[in-house]
Swiss-Prot record:
Source species of the chain: Drosophila grimshawi
Composition skew (Acidic residues), residue ranges: 481-491
Positions where Phosphothreonine occurs in the chain: T458, T1548
Protein name: AF4/FMR2 family member lilli
Entry similarity comment: Belongs to the AF4 family.
Length: 1883
């Protein structure tokens, strides 16, 4: 009844007011225009002029119909960030939309109404109007309806209110029609324009806010669910509802927005029409505009103020209707189908997507059960929004659930109490989500239809967080990188497309929309606090993770087992953890969670969901994501960077072949690298594929410090020491560190001490390991061990896990993240400065001990000594060796205790090995033996003496070390000799790994790198070595035993010159002491030594070197040396030769018995022992022959091997040891193959200091072992013939030589290197076939030819007094031993130099083509006085003159060893003089060679030698000038020669009269005494030569010897002073002389190259001077080319991109230079030359691009040819035939077809192929065209002389030039240009 009464009452009121309404309508119609004008004016005046203009412009556009409803627009056309600060977002989130609040305050509180009071056009106003306008149909009072509607949920509009809305709409329409024409939209039936705002159905500029006077609301348009937007005409999302009812009725209650699926990105709604539209009075032509609720008018006269409301009502309205409702992602996120309308490629590159992620509550709070306010992004959302949100989570959860397992909940997630099933996104991603951002998307909700998760077509991996923004810091901070590589936008667009396919919208965190959404989502301060807490919590977790990571790293480091994998993981957390550091962005989280933590820290700033989550995940795919999450997080991390799957992107990980165990972990998605807040300080990837190369990360010690941030985690305890050790070992083996040499030297000294300490500690630790444990350690995974070896000190670890080091060799194939230039580990996926290719062992850059030479064998070296023969030694080892093992390790002089402990382990292991083939244990012991790179030799010697017993370990160490020497070049060399020793000895199984290691370690032939042989040999060698050592120790007197052990030790040390050349010498010193002691008992000791040598495995090695040296030294040496050499060459030939030599030696012994009965006895014993051992055990024969311990043999070995082996002058014995060790290895290899003397190689390597050994300081030496057997046989024959003749003469000559040597040679003595340099430099250089400027080719077969006379002379020189005391006629044995022992240190200082000089000079004349002796070494070499004086003295005339002649002639003389007589004849003084003197070309050639150290000159020299290729055997160790500046003018050389000759004048003059007879006699006597076939051959030849010839040769040789000591001087001084310099002649070189430098895959090197390129480019960008700018640009180009060349070996696509971008850059540079090229005046000549170089570079780059695509081009040509051959298909006779193809268009097609010419239909694929072919062939065409342009410019600019000079010095640049040659050429040209510009007088 009450209702009926109310209805009646209402009806009465309606009737009563019906008339009033009509009157009011009329009044309103009259008042509206005025009201509108006033209101508009007010609003207009309230606005600032900027908005006024904008609105006017928009109004005009709307009136003109410029913007149509149907036009598809991105969510925001051009996001404008007025204040893109986080503070604005926070304010907006806190305050809500101020527009709505303002409107409410104006209407409800202040009472300002924007409509006439009777208008009732606004629901709010109507609800508040005193006299609401009520439709006849309406049954409810407006006030009650409004109040009730306020409480109603959206969408529940009461029917009365709907009726009222209809009535209002009709009235409004009527009123609008009554309005002034100015506001009437005229022809297009659009609702009248109310002054501002869009028409209800017309979307308006999204950014334009209501006239609130505030900045436009940031973020996406407010969705219909937001209450305030409903009343805003211009809010597209609200007004675009199909009916105005929804818009107007949203007044008091927020409308229920359309379902998420219908929300369109442009604000339009696709399917949801909202509440049904009321019938429109205007026929529905258009929705009447909602009364502009934004206009506030102060004109109270227009309408009565609304009745004042109760404050409680106002507050209720504010809280209910106008509460801050932050934008829900539902309203904001476009629906998945919107991809159709959402133009991802459109101008709006920063698209806005809003992720539906539940707000991150406090970590400890359980997730809200309902997805309502707690799960929704806004905690303040109304019940309506919560209702909306709850259903949304349902589809999201299953969709993201597949991601959850991928996320492998990071430790953060695991720590969260949140259950995964309830909140998979939280568990998987949001935990990592930087809470500050709070909006990271777990899954692209808008992309996913609400279909069940299984139905979702996209795989979970495709799901990517929506927030993938391009970091503006990347874009804007360094725009230079855009230019650095001339990145193409097409790549960016294409990659954005790829990303956009995954992400419906790429939202940038900093974008206004996202910030707005975030702000709204953050809503309350509570959320912000929670987020902050979460951030703190995340950071805390990350710190914990970092700590855990460090602990884990330490643990891993502690255990050598995880050497590879664990260390890699550790290292991969690059340089410093932190938000901005590389670790955050780049770490491919090796330890999933821990790495992720680092990433999370870095990403907290960027707020990438994937950043934390992915990083936490084990995969560690990128800075932001684990590999498992890979695509998802990576796309989230960057907007423009393509998904990591994009092929064109430079995936840094591509350049790192990933070890199998870390294939996934190391993958770093480039997107992640470029994520969020990445600054240019962090390496990353720019959109075009350019990499961000942080300049701050320089290759300096600072990096080492940075690395220690993480590495200290690994190396907390002894890491610092180990780091130094690593640096040392890298320096010794590979010189990995880029640190400057001075610093390195200082560090090395410190490091050596630290190493010794560390080694002691490690050894002590390792001692605990039993042989079994060592073997097990060897069984550890190769990659782990390998990694361990590299990261930690290779030596220390190898000693710790010797087998581990060996296994690391086997893992050499893997590319391990190597310590960066400053020890900084570089993550394989992300090099800090460069995309690098496979790591190539860096050439030794660190300072190597001055005496050490790193042999980088180029080409196959002669088979390394076979380790097999050590098996018999095993037996001996097991019995006798165990007790003495303690002392033998010479490697660690400092830590004898450690050695002993290790050796004890080694002894036990050795016994086990000998018994049970457990050489692994011995190997482990051996690696323990490893010593620091540089150790005082004396200490080592003392240790050796004390520890002489440990032959097995010493030999094993030597074996291992030998390979490391030769392998110095290899990365495994880092593991150092200890690793090699461990590899060889670790286990028979490990021996395979050891062989691998040796193979990797430079395929050092010395170690018998042939893995098969190694397999047999390594265990055999270990056991055999140990057994032989034991036997030797037992058999020999303690002195002899000590000497033998020291020999092996020294050999091992000498071989392992990479670790410590000094150590080798120290070993030799100890040996020397032992030998001196043995010298006392020359005969007995010799006999014992013979017996022991037969038994000593170490002596085998010596024998190998002795092949050459021993044979030359004496009969015994011959027996041993010949046998050993023959063994190396072939077992059969060895036996025969040995037998022959033994017979010869026996004959000689008979002759010698008259003079030396003691010697005869010793020799006979040695012979018998040798025969016995040689016949049954050829492999052991070398060991036996190593009996060089017999004074003669030992001395000879020491001479040959130590002169070769121990670059340090002091170590003869070390060289012998090296020879013995090599012999042992050879024995193991088997007699069938000759193998280069390991010790020789080692010694030679030491001789050539890498500092001076190569232009690149790589000090590479090629040692070639050539027909030693033939030479020996020939020598034997000659010896037999000459022995009888020369016996009598030798005595006299020896006496004379001794006198002369003592008196004369010491004074003038020039270092043998001088001789070598002078005589050998020119021919030898030219001969080096493969090596550019770095190599010295040494023919080991020729090393054997060092005349024993020379040794005798040297010994006589040094110990002439003793010789006289003992017997003047004592021959090689006594002469060698007693003086050798007594004066051994003295001899070591000089004899090795003599030997080296002879071997270097003599050998160099034969074998060493490119060997460079460092200046230090050259100076160090005491020129054996006997050598010089022998030339000068008549008594010494014969052999000495031959040596001199040979050595000097090595210069010009090109002996052919094949011709015995001819070979000798060439060494005849006459021939020498003729070749040397008359060949005036040679000095000029030398001059040209010396003119520049460039490899091209060496190539020229090679070409000159090409004529003399047959004479390749010239083993001249050419001393190449360190640089061009060291070249001496001819006058200076002559002066120097004259001075030296004047100093030596008397002896030389004396030598002339001594004449032929004395020379012959002396030679014969020496030959008889030494019975060395080589010298006999030479002596015979010399005897035949005339006295004048000898004198001339002596003169020339003396002059050569007198030449300056420095390498450059030696090289340059070679021309004889007499002959005038011949006119320079053109030197041509063959294209095949082009020897590419060995490609360096060293990561650090490539990084440095790229850094240098970018640094120069940036410098050029900022340079103002045009010439300097062009030169800098061009330098940058060549560095880019080197980088691309390095990349070419790993990733062709990246290489293509690099070359292409470089070509674009150089074209741009050339365009800048063109204005200067035009003028040919002298002012711009330099510009023309730069242009020439630039054009040539462009030509070569174009040609390179074609070559890279040559295979594709061939395929294209084949397919196209096939197509054209078959005639194709679809020939069109006339255009009308098209009608048949498309009959539907027959009418139009006929008309158009008549105009089309006849043609052929080409398939699309053929067309595409033709296009590509055109591109590729264009490169070829442009290459030749550009080259022709350069040539024309050379001619027209008169630059022919400049280019010709440049060509002569550096080799001509041709289209066949490699990038390294281009680099050298361009750099040389630019340097010349700069010099000419800076010092024009030089021109």
């Amino acid at each position: 009844m009450a209702q009926q009464q109310q209805q009646q009452h209402l009806q009465q009121q309606q009737q009563q007011h019906h008339q009033q309404q009509q009157l009011q309508q009329l009044q309103q119609q009259q008042q509206l225009p005025q009201y509108n004008n006033n209101l508009y004016n007010l609003n207009y005046n309230m606005e600032d002029p900027e908005r006024r203009k904008r609105r006017e412009r928009e109004k005009y556009e709307r009136q003109q119909g410029i913007q149509s409803d149907d036009r598809e627009t991105s969510l925001f056309e051009a996001p404008r960030r007025l204040n893109p600060s986080e503070g604005d977002n926070m304010i907006t989130a806190a305050l809500g939309e101020f527009v709505d609040a303002k409107e409410h305050m104006c209407m409800n509180m202040v009472g300002i109404h924007r409509q006439a009071p009777g208008g009732g056009s606004n629901a709010r106003l109507q609800g508040q109007a005193t006299t609401p306008i009520i439709n006849s149909l309406s049954s409810i009072n407006s006030t009650t309806t409004t109040s009730s509607s306020a409480s109603l949920l959206p969408g529940q509009l009461p029917t009365s209110q709907q009726q009222q809305q209809q009535q209002q709409q009709q009235q409004q329409h009527y009123q609008q029609q009554q309005r002034a024409p100015t506001y009437l939209k005229q022809a297009d039936n659009k609702p009248p324009y109310n002054g501002r705002g869009g028409y209800p159905g017309q979307p308006m500029k999204n950014d334009i806010p209501s006239s609130s006077g505030m900045a436009p609301p940031r973020g996406p348009p407010r969705s219909a669910s937001s209450s305030s937007s409903a009343s805003n005409n211009n809010s597209s999302s609200a007004t675009n509802n199909a009916t105005a009812a929804a818009a107007t009725s949203a007044s008091t209650a927020p409308l229920l927005g359309p379902p998420m699926s219908t929300q369109m990105p442009n604000g339009r709604e696709k399917s949801y029409l909202g509440p049904p539209a009321p019938a429109l009075s205007n026929g529905g032509r258009f929705v009447p505009p909602a009364a502009s609720g934004k206009r506030t008018s102060n004109t109270a006269g227009l309408q009565p103020p609304p009745p004042e409301k109760d404050i409680s009502k106002i507050i209720n309205e504010m809280t209910n209707s106008y509460r801050v409702t932050p934008l829900t992602s539902i309203a904001a996120t476009p629906h998945a189908p919107t991809r159709e309308n959402y133009n991802l490629n459109g101008p709006n590159k920063n698209k806005y997507a809003f992720d539906d992620v539940e707000p991150i509550g406090p970590l400890n709070s359980p997730p809200a059960a309902s997805g309502a306010s707690s799960s929704s992004l806004s905690c303040t959302t109304n019940s309506s929004s919560s209702l909306l949100m709850t259903p949304l989570l349902a589809p999201i959860a299953p969709i993201t659930s597949p991601i959850a397992p991928l996320l492998t909940t990071p430790p953060q997630a695991s720590q969260l109490p949140l259950p995964l099933p309830l909140l998979p996104p939280l568990a998987g991603a949001t935990t990592v989500l930087p809470p500050a951002l709070g909006m990271a998307a777990v899954a692209p909700i808008q992309q996913l239809m609400p279909t069940p998760p299984k139905a979702s077509p996209t795989p979970p991996t495709a799901i990517r967080p929506l927030k993938s923004e391009k970091n503006h810091s990347l874009e804007k901070q360094d725009s230079c990188l855009e230019n650095d590589l001339e990145l193409s936008e097409s790549d960016d667009d294409r990659k954005r497309d790829i990303c956009s396919a995954g992400n419906s919208s790429n939202s940038s965190e900093t974008d206004s929309s996202e910030s707005g959404s975030e702000a709204s989502s953050k809503g309350e301060a509570q959320q912000q606090q929670q987020q902050q807490q979460q951030l703190l919590h995340h950071q805390h977790q990350q710190q914990l993770l970092l700590q855990q990571q460090q602990q884990q790293q330490q643990q891993q480091r502690a255990t050598a087992t995880t050497a590879n994998g664990g260390n890699k993981k550790k290292c991969q957390t690059i340089i410093a953890s932190g938000a901005n550091t590389i670790s955050g962005l780049l770490t491919s989280s090796g330890l999933g969670g821990s790495g992720g933590a680092v990433n999370a820290t870095s990403n907290t700033n960027s707020g990438l969901l994937g950043g934390g989550g992915g990083s936490g995940s084990t995969g560690g795919g990128g800075g932001s994501s684990s590999s498992g999450m890979g695509n998802m997080s990576s796309s989230s991390s960057s907007n423009k960077t393509p998904s990591p799957t994009d092929s064109n992107r430079w995936h840094l990980s591509r350049f790192f072949p990933k070890p199998t165990n870390q294939a996934t972990a190391e993958s770093v998605s480039p997107g992640n690298v470029a994520c969020g807040n990445v600054s240019m300080k962090v390496p990353g990837i720019l959109p075009g594929g350019a990499q961000i190369i942080p300049e701050s990360i320089d290759v300096t010690t600072a990096i080492v410090k940075n690395e220690k941030l993480h590495d200290d985690t690994r190396r907390i305890t002894d890491d610092e020491d180990e780091d130094e050790q690593q640096q040392q070992r890298y320096a010794a083996g590979l010189s990995v560190t880029v640190k400057k040499e001075q610093q390195e030297q200082q560090q090395q000294q410190q490091q050596q001490q630290q190493q010794q300490q560390q080694q002691q500690q490690q050894q002590q630790q390792q001692q605990q390991l039993s042989a079994e444990q060592l073997a097990l350690a060897g069984a550890l995974p190769n990659n782990q061990i390998k990694r361990e070896v590299r990261l930690s000190d290779s030596a220390s670890i190898s000693s710790g896990s010797a087998s581990g080091s060996s296994s690391s060799d086997s893992a050499a194939g893997e590319v391990v993240p190597l310590p960066g230039p400053g020890e900084t580990l570089q993550i394989p996926g992300v090099p800090a400065a460069i995309t690098t290719v496979l790591r190539v062992p860096p050439a030794m850059q660190q300072k190597v001990p001055p005496n050490s030479v790193t042999l980088t064998p180029i080409g196959p070296l002669p088979a390394s000594p076979k380790p097999r023969q050590k098996k018999p030694r095993k037996k001996k080892m097991s019995a006798a060796t165990a007790p003495p093992l303690d002392s033998s390790d010479e490697d660690e002089p400092a830590s004898s205790n450690k050695k002993h402990a290790l050796e004890l382990a080694a002894t036990t292991a050795a016994a086990a090995a000998a018994i049970a083939a457990a050489p692994a244990a011995t190997a482990a012991a051996l690696p323990a033996v490893k010593k620091g790179r540089g150790r005082p030799r004396k200490q080592q010697q003392q240790l050796q003496q004390t520890q002489s017993g440990n032959l097995s370990s010493a030999s094993a160490g030597s074996l291992a070390k030998g390979p490391t020497l030769t392998a110095a070049k290899k990365p495994l060399a880092k593991s150092t000799a200890a690793a090699a020793a461990a590899a060889a000895l670790a286990a028979t199984a490990l021996t395979v790994a050891g062989s691998r290691k040796r193979e990797h370690s430079s395929n050092s032939s010395s170690n018998g790198n042939t893995p098969t042989k190694k397999l047999h040999a390594a265990p055999a060698t270990v056991a055999a070595a140990a057994a032989a050592a034991a036997a030797a120790t037992t058999l020999l007197p303690p002195t002899a035993a000590a000497g033998s052990s020291s020999d092996e030790d020294s050999t091992s040390s000498s071989c392992s010159s990479t670790k410590s050349s000094n150590s080798s010498s120290s070993g030799s010193d100890s040996e020397a002491t032992a030998t001196t002691a043995a010298a006392a008992t020359t005969a007995a000791a010799a006999a014992a030594a013979t017996t022991t040598t037969t038994q000593n495995p170490a002596k085998k090695r010596i024998v190998k070197i002795n092949k050459l040296g021993v044979v030359s030294s004496s009969k015994n040496n011959r027996l041993y040396g010949a046998g050993s050499s023959s063994n190396s060459s072939s077992s059969e030939t060895e036996e025969q030769q040995q037998q022959q030599q033994q017979h010869k030696q026996q004959q000689q012994l008979l002759l010698m018995q008259q003079q030396q009965q003691q010697q005869q006895q010793q020799q006979q014993k040695q012979q018998l022992q040798q025969h016995q051992q040689q016949q049954p055990l050829q492999p052991q024969q070398q060991q036996q022959q190593q009996s060089h311990f017999t004074p003669d043999a030992k001395q000879a070995r020491q001479r040959s091997s130590s002169s070769d082996g121990s670059s340090s002058s002091s170590t003869d014995s070390s060289s012998t040891n090296s020879s013995s060790s090599s012999d042992e290895v050879d024995v193991h290899h088997g007699g069938g193959k000759r193998k280069s003397d390991k010790k020789k190689i080692c010694t030679l390597t030491r001789i050539f200091n890498p500092k001076e050994g190569g232009a690149k300081k790589q000090g590479q030496v090629v040692i070639i072992d050539q027909s030693e057997e033939q030479l020996q046989q020939q020598q034997q024959q000659l010896q037999q013939q000459q022995q009888q003749q020369q016996q009598h003469q030798q005595q006299q000559q020896q006496q004379q030589q001794q006198e002369q040597q003592q008196s004369k040679e010491w004074k003038p003595r020039a270092t043998p290197t001088q001789l070598l340099g002078a005589t050998l430099a020119s021919p030898a250089r030219t001969t080096t076939p493969h090596l550019t400027s770095l190599m010295c080719k040494i023919d080991l077969s020729k090393l054997a030819r060092v005349p024993p006379e020379w040794y005798q002379k040297s010994y006589r020189q040094y110990a002439a007094e003793q010789q006289q005391q003992q017997q003047q006629h004592l021959h090689t044995q006594q002469l060698h031993h007693p003086p050798h022992h007594q004066h051994q240190h003295y001899q070591q200082q000089h004899q090795p130099h003599q030997q080296k000089a002879q071997q270097n000079g003599h050998l160099s004349s034969r074998s060493a083509e490119g060997a460079r002796t460092p200046k230090e070494l050259q100076q160090a070499y005491g020129m054996p006085n006997g050598y010089v004086t022998s030339g000068g003295a008549a008594g010494a005339a014969g052999a000495a003159s031959k040596l001199l002649g040979g050595v000097k002639h090595e210069h010009g003389v090109k002996p052919e060893p094949e011709l015995d007589a001819g070979y000798e004849a060439k060494y005849k003084p006459n021939s020498v003089k003729q070749e040397f003197m008359p060949k005036q070309e040679m000095p000029t050639r030398r001059r040209k060679r010396s003119s520049s150290s460039s490899p091209y000159k060496e190539k020229k020299r090679k070409k000159e030698k090409a004529d003399q290729v047959s004479k390749e055997l010239l083993p001249v160790p050419v001393l190449l000038p360190a640089n061009n500046h060291e070249r001496l003018s001819r006058d200076k050389l002559e002066l120097l020669q004259q001075e030296i000759s004047s100093a030596n004048g008397s002896p030389t003059k004396r030598s002339f009269p001594l004449a032929h007879a004395q020379q012959q006699q002396h030679q014969q006597q020496q030959q008889q005494q030494q019975h060395q076939p080589q010298h006999q051959q030479q002596l015979k030849a010399t005897t035949t030569t005339s006295t004048t010839a000898t004198v001339a040769a002596v003169q020339t040789s003396t002059t050569a010897t007198q030449q300056p000591t420095t390498c450059s001087e030696a090289v340059q001084t070679t021309p004889p002073p007499v002959a005038p310099p011949p006119p320079p002649r053109l030197i041509y070189r063959s294209h095949f002389d082009n020897e590419e430098e060995p490609p360096s895959d060293d990561l650090r090197k490539n990084e440095i190259l790229l850094q240098e390129a970018i640094r120069r480019k940036r410098a050029a960008d900022s340079e103002r001077d045009s010439f300097k700018q062009m030169t800098l640009y061009l330098e940058a180009i060549v560095y880019f080319l080197l980088t691309a060349d390095a990349m070419e070996r790993s990733n062709m696509e990246a290489t293509w991109t690099m070359y292409k971008d470089t070509l674009t850059l150089i074209k741009f540079i050339s365009s800048k230079n063109r204005p200067y090229q035009q003028s040919t005046n002298g002012k711009h000549e330099s510009h023309n030359i730069v242009a020439i170089l630039s054009l040539r570079c462009q030509s070569l780059i174009s040609l390179k691009l074609y070559k890279l695509r040559r295979a594709n081009c061939r395929a294209i040509i084949a397919s196209c040819s096939e197509f054209f051959r078959t005639g194709g298909r679809g020939d069109i006779l006339n255009g009308n035939t098209l009608s048949s193809i498309s009959p539907s268009n027959s009418v139009g097609s006929q008309g158009s077809g008549s105009n089309t010419p006849p043609g052929r239909i080409v398939p699309q694929d053929i067309h595409n192929q033709l296009c590509r072919q055109n591109e590729y062939l264009t490169y070829v065409n442009s290459a030749h065209d550009l080259w022709d342009q350069a040539d024309r410019l050379v001619r027209t600019g008169n630059h022919i002389d400049f280019i010709r000079k440049l060509d002569h010095e550096n080799g001509p640049m041709t289209l066949h030039s490699t990038m390294h040659e281009v680099f050298r050429y361009v750099q040389a040209g630019l340097k010349t240009l700069r010099d000419s510009v800076s010092y024009p007088q030089s021109q």
